């Protein structure tokens, strides 16, 4: 199964991100926007894993989750990968993400022991859409600039989730396989 490890975002943040997607729209570029219910912060993309690996990963995540406290983060601003001149992914930034960075690093280190490739530099973000092609580079840049410091609200990071991703012609369908609450 295709899987990843993620943090879920609140309903109010989802609403704000959908409004940003609507604002960006599709006039300046053909963008495949992420569905509202699929917004998340990826801690690690795993790719194809077996049931056995999933069980190993669950044990690791359970152990890691207990070490960190639930905490509030703020979702603010729009960024792009790889760079503003060549926009492929549009994302919302996450502020106050020091704990998330630590969690991601620990997951990365632990899973490297199981043979997963190490990620390197982690940027906490919520993907809004993937750009297929740009029709009006300047127009798109202007819209993204206007959202550069937009506040999308805050939410409490409560758990780490192991998610399964099933690719369909309509887009991916995510299913939570296991959820590990952070400590109070």
Curated annotation (Swiss-Prot):
Q: Which purpose does this protein serve, as stated in its record?
A: Hydrolyzes RNA 2',3'-cyclic phosphodiester to an RNA 2'-phosphomonoester. In vitro, ligates 5' and 3' half-tRNA molecules with 2',3'-cyclic phosphate and 5'-hydroxyl termini, respectively, to the product containing the 2'-5' phosphodiester linkage. Ligase activity requires GTP, but GTP hydrolysis is not required for the reaction, which is reversible. Ligase activity is weak compared to the phosphodiesterase activity.
Q: Which PANTHER family match?
A: RNA 2',3'-CYCLIC PHOSPHODIESTERASE (PTHR35561:SF1)
Protein keywords: Hydrolase
Q: What is this protein called?
A: RNA 2',3'-cyclic phosphodiesterase
Q: Which residues form the active site?
A: 40 (proton donor), 125 (proton acceptor)
Task: List the HAMAP family.
Answer: RNA_CPDase (MF_01940)
Motif HXTX 1: which residue numbers?
A: 40-43
Q: Which reaction does it catalyse?
A: a 3'-end 2',3'-cyclophospho-ribonucleotide-RNA + H2O = a 3'-end 2'-phospho-ribonucleotide-RNA + H(+)
Domain of life according to the entry: Archaea
Q: Which organism is it from?
A: Pyrococcus furiosus (strain ATCC 43587 / DSM 3638 / JCM 8422 / Vc1)
GO MF term list: 2',3'-cyclic-nucleotide 3'-phosphodiesterase activity; RNA 2',3'-cyclic 3'-phosphodiesterase activity
Q: Where does the record locate the signal sequence feature? A: none
Against InterPro entries, the record matches this protein to: Cyclic_Pdiesterase (IPR009097), Phosphoesterase_HXTX (IPR014051), RNA_CPDase (IPR004175)
Please indicate the residue ranges that the annotation assigns to the motif HXTX 2: 125-128
| EC number of the protein | 3.1.4.58
Q: Which family does it belong to?
A: Belongs to the 2H phosphoesterase superfamily. ThpR family.
């Amino acid at each position: 199964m295709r899987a990843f490890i993620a943090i879920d975002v609140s309903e109010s943040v989802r609403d704000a991100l959908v409004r940003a997607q609507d604002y960006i729209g599709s006039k300046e570029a053909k963008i495949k926007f992420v569905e509202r219910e699929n917004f998340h912060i990826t801690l690690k993309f795993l790719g194809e894993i077996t049931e056995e690996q999933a069980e190993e990963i669950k044990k690791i995540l359970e152990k890691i989750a207990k070490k960190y406290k639930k905490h509030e983060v703020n979702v603010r601003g729009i960024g792009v990968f790889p760079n503003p001149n060549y926009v492929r992914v549009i994302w919302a930034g996450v502020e106050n993400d020091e704990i998330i960075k630590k969690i991601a690093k620990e997951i990365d280190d632990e899973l490297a022991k199981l043979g997963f490739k190490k990620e390197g530099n982690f940027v906490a973000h919520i993907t809004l859409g993937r750009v297929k092609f740009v029709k009006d580079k300047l127009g798109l840049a202007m819209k993204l600039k206007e959202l550069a410091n937009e506040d999308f609200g805050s939410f409490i990071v409560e758990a780490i989730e192991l998610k399964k991703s099933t690719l369909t012609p309509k887009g991916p369908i995510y299913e939570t396989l296991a959820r590990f609450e952070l400590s109070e």
